[in-house]
UniProtKB/Swiss-Prot annotation:
Descriptive protein name: Large ribosomal subunit protein uL3c
GO MF, any single term: structural constituent of ribosome
InterPro entries for this protein: Ribosomal_uL3, Ribosomal_uL3_bac/org-type, Transl_B-barrel_sf
Compartment list: Plastid, Chloroplast
Role played: One of the primary rRNA binding proteins, it binds directly near the 3'-end of the 23S rRNA, where it nucleates assembly of the 50S subunit.
Keywords: Chloroplast, Plastid, Ribonucleoprotein, Ribosomal protein, RNA-binding, rRNA-binding
Amino acid sequence: MKIGLLGKKIGMTQIFDPGGKALPVTILKLGPCLITDIKKMESHGYAAIQIGYVKVNGNKLNKAQIGHLNKYNMPLVKFLKEYKVASTENYQIGKWITVEDLSINQNISVSGTSIGKGFTGCIKRHNFSRGPMSHGSKNHRQPGSIGAGTTPGKVFAGKKMAGRMGGKKVTIQNLKIIDIKINNNLIIVKGSVPGKPGNIVSIYQ
């Protein structure tokens, strides 16, 4: 059964494997997530489940969100997300998905919002090389030429220039689950995960 879960990034640390090698790991607190809706191939044209995470008061949601959750008498949840599945036969509305549905040594993909860096130059943002720092040069950290002259007479779209960096959705694939703490809804994955501690993350197989 394909699993998708929402949760929060707790932070990074390191653990040691049986051979004494230090492994960089990230701790994630996932779920429990409630199946709030099921999209079937016959009625919607695709098969998916919708899950909800973090119970909230009604004043935190708009009327459309409250009406959607009240359709099946669901608890009010703040975050909703859909995950496509091959078949919806193994899922029921109102069922809870927890870390118990995951297994150690399983590979998962983790999506989150990367740390925003603000407005940055082309050296930090695109790894440009800087110009000379002496001998009369005034072109230290400038981008250089951004195109030809009269022909084409414009800067082409997508040109690498200074701008906002980070703060975008990033997905890291094939992170290995090292350990699962069922009582605390925690999993430990090898490697790093996008975003700051406390950020909402989405995991799926």
